[in-house]
């Protein structure tokens, strides 16, 4: 880590109260592949992205969620548990948890990802959260993960079990728009962009021909979901 990176790592620990023995693990968890590639191409040696930690974190998350389900819902059918596990470990839920702890603020992103709104993209936040789980697991063990996140995930799991939270921003946006305008929102692919060699889809969501939000993603579906989320949150603020 250089000095500016260390300051961000230290600020993350101060703001969240999650203190690492090995700060390099935390740095790696916060390091998106676009940033690692950019730094390595600039001549730095062995700047590693969070992809391997994300791989481990996916398994840690699955165990964590399954343990909560096994203990709290002993009478539930296996099929129901599998459905809830999938929802509780979904990109949408992980992005919610990430936003609550302001994880996006501390991510190291390449210039392209920064420019295209990667800091608040569900997929990037969810991947970074999984990487963070792995880093905590390696640094402080599984019990620390339970201490930090068990209560929050129990809350989401309970809502999912009750059918109150299988959240779909596109459906939620459509309900608001149709109640006010009597027509569904329209999703329009306006262009594609290049970012570190990857194609980024840019989608506008429109109501009565007027653009209300723009989303970006590595697939058209992801860009539509992002546009729907931004539009939904914007409309909620306007209603408040």
From Swiss-Prot:
Catalytic activities: Endonucleolytic cleavage to 5'-phosphomonoester
Single GO cellular component term: cytoplasm
Coiled coil location: none
Domain DRBM per the UniProt entry, residue ranges: 168-237
Pfam families: dsrm, Ribonucleas_3_3
Binding site for Mg(2+): 54, 127, 130
Gene3D superfamilies: 3.30.160.20, Ribonuclease III domain
Active site: 58, 130
Gene Ontology biological-process entries: mRNA processing; regulation of gene expression; rRNA processing; tRNA processing
First and last residue of the signal peptide: none
Top-rank EC class of the record's enzyme: hydrolase
Domain RNase III: 9-141
Names of the cofactor(s): Mg(2+)
KW tRNA processing (keyword) present: yes
Subcellular location: Cytoplasm
GO molecular function, one term: double-stranded RNA binding
Domain of life: Bacteria
Record EC number: 3.1.26.3
Oligomer and partners: Homodimer.
Similarity annotation: Belongs to the ribonuclease III family.
NCBIfam families: RNaseIII
Protein name: Ribonuclease 3
Species: Thermotoga sp. (strain RQ2)
């Amino acid at each position: 880590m250089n000095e500016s990176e260390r300051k961000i790592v230290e600020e993350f620990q101060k703001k969240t109260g999650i203190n690492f023995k090995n700060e390099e693990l935390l740095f790696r968890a916060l390091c998106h592949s676009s940033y690692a590639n950019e730094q390595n191409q600039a001549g730095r040696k062995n700047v590693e992205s969070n992809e391997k930690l994300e791989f481990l974190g996916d398994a840690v998350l699955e165990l964590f969620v399954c343990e909560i389900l096994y203990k709290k819902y002993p009478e539930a059918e296996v099929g129901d548990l599998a459905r809830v596990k999938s929802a509780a470990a979904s990109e949408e839920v992980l992005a919610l948890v990430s936003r609550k702890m302001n994880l996006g603020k501390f991510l190291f992103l390449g210039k392209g990802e920064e420019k295209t709104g990667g800091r608040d993209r569900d997929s990037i936040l969810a991947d970074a959260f999984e990487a963070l789980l792995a880093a905590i697991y390696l640094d402080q063990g599984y019990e620390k993960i339970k201490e930090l996140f068990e209560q929050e995930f129990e809350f989401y799991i309970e809502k999912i079990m009750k059918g109150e939270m299988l959240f779909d921003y596109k459906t939620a946006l459509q309900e608001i728009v149709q109640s006010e305008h009597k027509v569904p929102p329209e999703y329009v692919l306006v262009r594609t962009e290049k970012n570190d060699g990857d194609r980024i889809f840019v989608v506008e969501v429109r109501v009565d021909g007027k653009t209300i939000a723009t989303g970006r993603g590595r697939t058209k579906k992801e860009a539509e979901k992002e546009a729907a989320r931004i539009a939904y949150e914007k409309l909620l603020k306007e209603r408040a």
